[in-house]
């Protein structure tokens, strides 16, 4: 199996930090025989983890294609790597995808499919008083990197309840820090709450006695929203249509496989952490984390558009409006380009 992992990860309490080291950042690599894929070492990214580990993707793209994996802990970092042409396809949340699409004027990114729905929660300290909106003044609440999906959701939730962060003249301290740092500060009692994805949400509950105030999907229509999307770099997609087509087919096959083999999928995820990170998560954390999300290839388009509306209301999308036309890959509209490429 032609798979290489371009990362070294250390684990503190469970996962302490991620150091990203690219095997190659060259945009001059021959792209016909390699696909560089980015994802996170987290439950919501079960599709690439399980599908690569059990060989579905390798069989789908063929043995002549090398799959090079790169692990990240931040969506905005993934998008910057897309811009640097060091990644070809990636699994990432809607917030960074939207920002990246607009930053590139719609030229660099296409959404191919969904990968997960749900899987984020608002976790609070048991004595924080955050179970009542009246008690938010002066509280310290964390989310991962600014403008990522959880950050947008947290800030929109505050705005929906007539609250503002300190930097906007409000009364709530919003801290944008990495998931491992959120874990550390929560353990020390230095933050009152955190809006985080799985498995971090369940780790805060099971290991640090946090209280899950609610799962984010409870705030969405039909209790579903796109939390992880499969995207491709547009020029890679145009230059390698058959490879991307096979990747997408394998992606959908993996979604079906995971939903039909839940226990084995959890076992594969646990083995992945042990093999690539040196330590896994307790089985009970993996079980609960998986139960808090849905693995799906549906991008839930309306939720992506709603994310954009919310990000725009927070001032994340600039002052001149935004246009997401073309963000979703439509194979029929790209048929001519594909035929041209396949015919040489």
Residue ranges of each PLM-predicted region?
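Short, low-complexity disordered leader/linker segments with a strong preference
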Residues: 1-34, 338-344
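Short, glycine-/small- and polar/acidic-enriched structural segments
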Residues: 30-176, 192-198, 213-214
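Stable alpha-helical elements in mature extracytoplasmic
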Residues: 44, 53, 74, 78, ...
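Short, solvent-exposed loop/beta-turn-alpha elements that line the ligand-binding surface or hinge
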Residues: 58-65, 218-221, 291-299
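Pocket-lining segment of extracytoplasmic ligand-binding domains
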Residues: 105, 128, 167-171, 175, ...
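Secondary-structure end/capping motifs
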Residues: 238-318
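Conserved C-terminal helix/tail region of periplasmic/extracytoplasmic solute-binding proteins
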Residues: 309-344
């Amino acid at each position: 199996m032609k798979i290489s992992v371009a990362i070294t990860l250390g684990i503190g309490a469970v996962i302490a930090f991620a150091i990203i080291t690219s095997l190659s950042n060259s945009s001059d690599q021959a792209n016909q025989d390699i696909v560089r894929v980015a994802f996170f070492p987290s439950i919501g990214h079960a599709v690439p983890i399980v599908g690569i580990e059990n060989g579905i993707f390798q069989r789908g793209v063929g043995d002549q294609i090398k799959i090079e994996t790169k692990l990240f802990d931040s969506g905005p970092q993934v998008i910057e790597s897309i811009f640097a042409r060091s990644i070809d396809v990636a699994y990432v949340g809607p917030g960074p995808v939207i920002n990246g699409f607009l930053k590139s004027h719609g030229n660099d990114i296409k959404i191919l499919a969904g990968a997960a729905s749900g899987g984020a929660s608002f976790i609070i300290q048991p004595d924080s008083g955050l179970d009542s909106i009246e008690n938010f003044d002066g509280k310290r609440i964390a989310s991962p990197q600014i403008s990522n999906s959880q950050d947008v959701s947290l800030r929109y939730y505050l705005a929906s309840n007539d609250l503002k962060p300190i930097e906007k003249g409000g009364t709530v301290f919003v801290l944008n820090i990495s998931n491992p740092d959120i874990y550390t500060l929560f353990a020390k009692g230095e933050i009152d709450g955190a809006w985080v994805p799985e498995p971090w949400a369940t780790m805060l509950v099971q290991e640090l006695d946090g209280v899950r105030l609610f799962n984010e999907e409870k705030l969405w229509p039909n209790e579903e929203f796109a939390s992880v999307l499969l995207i491709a770099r547009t020029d890679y997609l145009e230059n390698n249509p058959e490879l991307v087509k096979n990747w997408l087919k394998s992606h959908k096959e993996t979604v079906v496989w995971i939903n039909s083999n839940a226990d084995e999928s959890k076992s594969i995820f646990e083995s992945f952490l042990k093999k690539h990170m040196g330590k896994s998560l307790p089985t009970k954390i993996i079980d609960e984390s998986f139960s808090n999300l849905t693995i799906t290839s549906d991008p839930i388009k309306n939720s992506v558009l709603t994310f954009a509306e919310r990000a725009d209301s927070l001032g994340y999308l600039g002052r001149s409006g935004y246009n997401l036309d073309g963000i979703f890959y439509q194979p029929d509209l790209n048929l001519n380009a594909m035929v041209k490429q396949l015919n040489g």
